[in-house]
Design a protein with these regions (language model features):
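N-terminal Sec signal peptide and the immediately downstream disordered periplasmic leader
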Residues: 1-88, 94-100, 259, 328, ...
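Gram-negative outer-membrane beta-barrel transporters
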Residues: 37, 460, 583, 588-590, ...
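Outer-membrane beta-barrel translocator/receptor signature
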Residues: 130-132, 144, 153-162, 167-249, ...
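Periplasmic-side early beta-strands and strand-to-turn transitions of outer-membrane beta-barrels
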Residues: 179, 186-188, 196, 207-303, ...
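Structural signature of Gram-negative outer-membrane beta-barrels, strongest in the C-terminal barrel
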Residues: 254-258, 384-385, 399-401, 437-589
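Membrane-embedded beta-barrel scaffold of Gram-negative outer-membrane proteins
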Residues: 329-335, 339-357, 522-538, 558-619, ...
Length: 786
């Protein structure tokens, strides 16, 4: 990224690039006449107490495709309001794990990212595979986890559903769903401006404008821009890394000609230009017979290693990613005779990713390596919901999802490549290798779920889904370019790592059933108990990188179907005169043919594989309480024992694979699954003073703890993520001005400057690289709603 693009946020050049929404919000307005005539009430944020109230508000969700209280839904779920996200300054999907239990986000950058729930679904960089956790925004399924890696702006509500899903809506998943709902256009004028400034060059500005265009049509426009200098120092040239810029907008129209029909159109665009995903050296791996392979090869190549825990790297090439993504959707809802509701959701999205990656050294072992991706997806959903209040109510629907993805794998080796890779002299030095992959997916499904209200207190729910998917793919690699003419061992090594390859046509056809049985009983008016059995399946996929396929055969590129069986037992309660909400559940899940990532040490590529069977079992709880007027506390946590029941042909950790007489594979049965902390605990709270002069001072605090976790799939002693806890504080003041409300807050993220790692990565030669969490950051935010 050029220095020009990282200019100070207070320069005239930077001010010219403020989002259009801020300009609109400052200059445009809807007449107060519309506001006076509107019958749309001002919304109360979900899960927050109303002004001057000591009782919790009802949180409304549409999890079962009809509006109802979250406490009436007999399934484990977490609901976070948009206001809570703003108060806790959680504006990226990778920070969500600091708010809710059983969620882990493995994030490096937009491509190398994945979301897991209860330890299931941690498979980043899966170009040829959908995730085990479904990500939705405004009821549209996102085929790539990276499609959710943008700033969460203008959010109404975020819901996390745990366990297999698919009998009610959208795409089938085996681990759960994260459903993000943005604020819809309003027939009451709304405008907001927000700007934040913090350490390390952090600057974020957001704006929203909403209101009526006429009696039947309302519009909404939101935009943001975020930038930072970065928090990792490159010793090679003195530059700051792990920063950059992100910006985007969302435009909406809501057409509501009468009470029986509404249509909502959404269009959005986001882009990123950053050095996100800068990995630091975490561990150089094992020393065997007095030799540390990582250090010895680095020394032989002339590289100087630096301590990553000091937030330093030593890179002689760029670390850079660009992302362009966007899409459009149309949702229409009709109220039919007899109060049936018909819903149609149509969408199109695109996602383009281009990286530039260094090899982690300050010598030219590699000039650039990575995978660029271009993805387009289409979806159509139809749902019919029966009227509420009958003995039997139900939802039936049909769903189509299509995806067309191309990727390009590239490696530009430098003169020190053979020393660093341990290949014969001349094999890789100055060689260029380029490969291409393509996969087309067509998924068709029918689903239905119904509830029998057997008595006033007892309900029985059953759901079923049938999914049929076709995937066609191919993978190629061009003949290597450059390098010296070689023979013997060097030629063999070059053919293995960079030789020409063509997989031919690869095809997969799968039929995946899903099912749900649920019994719920209203123990008292304020306590609901439930038990659930569910089954979910997710079709297989294709490795879109050559890897070992020239030796193992093209069939080795195919990944089998993942199947999950799940059981839940839990309760939901609202107690203490609606001042305490307490929910808890136990769960047991077994996944067969679990899809995960592994590392091919010989070819130095990540690849997808089926890792035998996995069992996840544990307990989760969530509570919200108002112990006294003005104070709201949220406490949640989980214990999750997730391990491989069977994983016999797993990759070996370097302390085994580098030892003399090492086996070709290892048995990891009984080992903990990668990325899954056994213990997770989160607590946050806000205290507000309602003063007679109209001012509202407040303070907030949050605490997030995660126990240690396995860093990479081979479960090396040198690749473990230590436990950590992060503490955040903020204080602010709200007040009224000119029929609007202003707010100023001072915030401190990672208050005790804890050095912690969120994700680990296999670095080659037995070493490991890590992604550091955000250091202590002090900032200030100003906001005006009017």
């Amino acid at each position: 990224m050029s220095p020009l693009n990282l200019a100070s946020p207070l320069t005239p050049r930077r001010l010219k690039r403020l989002p259009l929404a801020l300009l609109l919000a400052g200059s445009a307005s809807w007449t107060h006449g519309y506001a006076a005539d509107s019958e749309t009430p001002a919304p109360v944020p979900a899960g927050k107490p109303a002004a001057n109230s000591s009782q919790l508000e009802t949180v409304t969700v549409t999890t079962r495709r009809r509006e109802e209280s979250s406490q009436d839904v007999p399934t484990p779920m977490s609901v976070v309001s948009g206001q809570n996200l703003e108060t806790q300054r959680v504006y990226r999907i990778q920070d969500l794990q600091q708010l809710v239990p059983s969620v882990n986000v493995a994030y490096m950058h937009a491509r190398q990212s994945s979301v897991s729930i209860r330890g299931l679904g941690n498979n980043p960089a899966s170009d040829g595979l959908e995730g085990s956790v479904g990500l939705y925004i405004d009821n549209v399924y996102l085929g790539r986890p990276g499609m959710a890696v943008f700033d969460l702006m203008d959010i109404e509500q975020l819901e996390v559903l745990r366990g297999p899903q698919g009998t009610l809506f959208g795409k089938n998943t085996t681990a759960g769903v994260i459903n993000i709902s943005t604020r819809a256009p309003t027939f009451t004028p709304e405008r907001s401006i927000e700007t934040s400034v913090g350490e390390d060059g952090y600057f974020q500005t957001k704006g929203t404008i909403s209101g009526p265009l006429n009696d039947q049509l309302a519009g909404r426009f939101s935009a943001y821009r975020t930038r930072s200098d970065g928090d990792i120092k490159n010793e090679y040239d003195g530059d700051d890394l792990n920063g950059g810029s992100r910006e985007g907008f969302r435009a909406q129209l809501l057409f509501k000609p009468n009470e029986d029909f509404n249509l909502r159109w959404i269009g959005d665009y986001n882009e990123e230009d950053s050095s996100a995903g800068t990995r630091v050296l975490y561990n150089t791996g094992p020393t065997i017979n007095g030799v540390n392979l990582y250090q010895s090869r680095a020394n032989a190549a002339g590289a100087t290693l630096v301590n990553g825990s000091h937030r330093k790297v030593n890179l002689d090439n760029d670390q850079h990613v660009t992302v362009h993504q966007g899409g459009t959707s149309v949702e229409a809802n009709w109220t039919l005779p007899s109060d049936f509701t018909l819903t149609s959701i149509s969408s199109y999205r695109f996602w383009n990713f281009t990286p530039r990656n260094d090899d982690g050294l300050n010598v030219p072992a590699s000039y650039n390596a990575g995978v660029s991706v271009e993805d387009k997806q289409y979806s159509q959903e139809f749902r019919l919901a029966s009227p509420k209040g009958e003995f039997f109510d139900y939802v039936v629907g049909a769903y189509y999802f299509g995806s067309d993805l191309d990727n390009k794998s590239f490696a530009y080796y430098g003169p020190q490549a053979d020393i660093w890779n341990g290949t014969a002299p001349g094999a890789l030095a100055n060689v260029t290798s380029v490969g291409n992959g393509h996969i087309k997916t067509d998924s068709f499904a029918l689903f239905a779920q119904g509830t029998w209200h057997l008595t006033e207190r007892l309900d029985f729910t059953a759901g079923v889904r049938g999914t049929y998917e076709e995937k066609s793919a191919w993978v190629t690699r061009d003949a290597p370019l450059g390098g010296a003419t070689v023979t013997g061992a060097a030629a063999t090594a070059r053919r293995g790592r960079a030789g020409a390859y063509d997989s031919g046509d690869l095809n997969q056809y799968s039929s995946s059933p899903s099912g749900l049985l649920n019994l719920s009983y209203r123990i008292t008016d304020d306590v609901l108990g439930y038990a659930t059995l569910s089954h979910g399946e997710k079709s297989g996929g294709v490795n879109l990188a050559v890897g070992s396929a020239p030796v193992a055969g093209a069939d080795s590129l195919l990944i089998g179907t993942e199947r999950a069986n799940n059981a839940e037992l839990g309760f939901k309660s609202t107690l203490w005169d609606h001042r305490l909400q307490l929910n808890a559940n136990v769960f047991w899940t077994q996944v067969n043919a679990y899809q995960t990532n592994a590392y091919d040490a010989e070819n130095r590529v990540q690849y997808l594989t089926n890792a035998g069977s996995v069992r996840s079992r544990g307990v989760e709880f969530e509570s919200t309480v108002i112990p006294l007027r003005g104070l709201t506390l949220n406490i949640n946590g989980s214990y999750n024992d997730v391990s491989y029941l069977s994983y016999k042909d797993a990759p070996c950790p370097p302390e085994v694979s580098q030892a003399p007489g090492a086996p070709a594979s290892c048995d990891l049965s009984g080992h903990q699954v990668v990325g899954a902390s056994k213990w997770i605990g989160n607590a946050n709270g806000e205290y507000k003073w309602n003063l007679d002069n109209g001012f509202e001072p407040y303070v907030t605090a949050s605490y997030a703890f995660r126990s240690k976790a396995v860093g990479t799939v081979e479960d090396s002693d040198y690749g473990q993520i230590p436990s950590y806890a992060v503490v955040n504080f903020s204080t602010g003041l709200r007040g009224d001005f000119n029929q609007g409300q202003w707010e100023v807050s001072l915030w401190l993220k990672n208050a005790f400057d804890k050095t912690y790692y969120t994700t680990l990565w296999t670095g080659g030669n037995g070493g490991y690289e890590g992604l550091l969490g955000t250091p202590r950051t002090l900032g200030v935010t100003g906001r005006y709603d009017f």
